[in-house]
Every structure is written in C-alpha cells, then in structure tokens.
Amino acid sequence: MSRLLVNNIRAYSGSVITVPATTKLSLGGKTISQNSVLPSASGNANKAVGSDGTSIIYDTFGANNMQVFTSSGTYTKSAGVNQIMVRLVGGGGGSSGHCESGGAAGFSEKIINVSGISSVSVVIGQGGTGTYYSGRSGPGSSSSFGSFLSATGGDGANQSYQHAGGIGGLGAGGDVNMYGGGGSAHGQVNGAGGYSFFGGCAARGHPRGGDYARNHMRRSAPGSGGANGWFSSYLGPEGMHGICVVWEFK
C-alpha cells in the first residue's frame, strides 16, 4: 500500500490545493521542480510539452518552419529558432548538342546552432551553358550558406576533353558532403545528365525532335546536369540552377 505524507497542504474553495514553495514533490523517486507537473492546457491545442530551460511549457518543438532559396539572398532567422538544418546544391553543368551531358552539382548538409545568429548570406549557383557538338559546355557555379557550407557546380560536357561527360561537383563544410553524378560521354545516345541529390535531369533529345531536350531543360531537379541532345546542329541544354533549403527548429 502506498502512503502520501503531507505537510501544510491547504485546500481553498474545495477544489484548489496550494503547496508551499518550500515543499518539494516527488514522483517515482524523481523530484518535480517548481511544484508543477504541467501548465494549463487551455489555449495550447496541437502543442507539445517541453522545457525552455527554466519552466515546463507548451510549444511547437522540432522543425516548425522552412525557408527555400532558388536565387541568392539573405536567410533571416524566425523568432524562437535555435537550430537549423541546411541542405544545398550548386548549379549543374551544361551539355552538348550531340551526346555528351553535364555533371551534377555537389551536395552539402549541416546542422547549425543559430542562437547567436540573426541572418546569413545565401548564394545560389547557376547552371552551366550548353554548347554545340564540338564546343565545351559551361560549368555550374557554386552555392553557399555564409561560411558554414558550400557546394561546387558540376562540370560542363567536354570540359575535361572532347566527347567526355561532365564531372560532378562536391560539397564542403557540411556534416554530410557528397559528389554529384557524372554526365554521359559521346556515343551514349540519349544519355542522362548527372543526377543531383534532389533528382535527375530533363528528357533527352532525338534528331527528329530538334530542340526537344533544350525546350524542356527546366523540368529538372535542382543541381542536375544538362541532358544531352542528339544532333550536332542543336545547342545542348543548360544545367539546372542550385537550391538551398533551410529547416528551422525551436
């Protein structure tokens, strides 16, 4: 049989029990601080119970907001946010009009304590330009989140040497850093552009389709390499621009 030992507990109006501030409550062998089990649930629908370091409170914990950057700008921290998780890729490399495709951008991910930070500069890498059969496609440019993490763009087709697919970029500074996928070489008809962390490239071309691949080049995942064309008279698709995704945590 359990026993409840009380000392100077007083009841008011038959419903409210007041415990003196000097009295400690123990539950399951653990002391409950501030004589409080839970704050009032009134007005706290869909919120969780947690601690702000001083008191037990109701609040929205975990990831409670997201900011997405598809162009360069400034990240401004939302109220009450202490940590963020950032994922970003650079710009994908451009492709050739005849078989060779671009490399995908690198990827980086990092969890950052932002309790002492209010804003961070964000740079989004641009996709590389396409080329005709014999030229060199442009490389994608780098994305970055302040000085915390960055990711280089993918190489364009024919950058290393003629008829070579583009090499993937690489992330840096993150808790996770990855290469982007490489592009296809000459002779790989309908070869895909390099895949980024976020997905693949647009549809590939065909001589009877003319500029088909280039016309649909924006239907690609961020940071992916340009898909190859399949006819030397047409300009290859560009690489896809980068992206930065910021999850905010309280």
Task: Give the label of every model feature segment.
Residues 2-62:
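Extracellular repetitive beta-rich solenoid segments
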Residues 37-43, 64-71, 165-170:
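Disulfide-bonded cysteine-rich modules in secreted/extracellular proteins
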Residues 43-47, 82-83, 241-242:
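Short, surface-exposed beta-edge/turn micro-motifs
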Residues 122, 198, 202-204:
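Glycine-rich, flexible loop motifs
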Residues 26-30, 47, 121-127, 221-224:
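Short sequence segments immediately N-terminal to proteolytic processing junctions that release a mature
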Residues 9, 184-190:
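Feature marking protein-protein/ligand interface regions
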Residues 128-176:
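Acidic, low-complexity glycine/serine/threonine-rich segments
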Residues 68, 74-78, 85-147, 226-245:
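Glycine-rich strand-loop-strand elements at beta-sheet edges
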